[in-house]
């Protein structure tokens, strides 16, 4: 006789292994563990996408703060960089703003020349 799928014991073991470290029944009772694991996997999937958005927002906030400290707005700065043909992504602009303020000031001057 052919058996379809894997044994239920193996599947339950896998779910309980994923639920290891959870508090209370969620780590010991299969039904509760299954619900907790499914919920955790949903959050994991959602948050992998949210992380990208949150980091982009953080980079933009840092660039904006550095721009305003040098007397320019973020939107004018980005527009000036585009017109100047400087192709730097927001992550690297953020790093430059934090680690090398003098170089960032030069970028602002270049952007200022192309905006006005």
Curated annotation (Swiss-Prot):
Keyword rRNA-binding assigned: yes
An annotated Gene Ontology molecular function: structural constituent of ribosome
GO BP terms in the entry: ribosomal large subunit assembly; translation
Keyword Transcription: no
Domain of life (superkingdom): Bacteria
One GO cellular component term: ribonucleoprotein complex
TM spans (from-to): none
SUPFAM superfamilies: Ribosomal protein L20
Pfam families: Ribosomal_L20 (PF00453)
UniProt keyword annotations, A-Z: Ribonucleoprotein, Ribosomal protein, RNA-binding, rRNA-binding
NCBIfam families in alphabetical order: rplT_bact (TIGR01032)
Function: Binds directly to 23S ribosomal RNA and is necessary for the in vitro assembly process of the 50S ribosomal subunit. It is not involved in the protein synthesizing functions of that subunit.
Family: Belongs to the bacterial ribosomal protein bL20 family.
Protein name, UniProt field: Large ribosomal subunit protein bL20
Gene encoding the protein: rplT
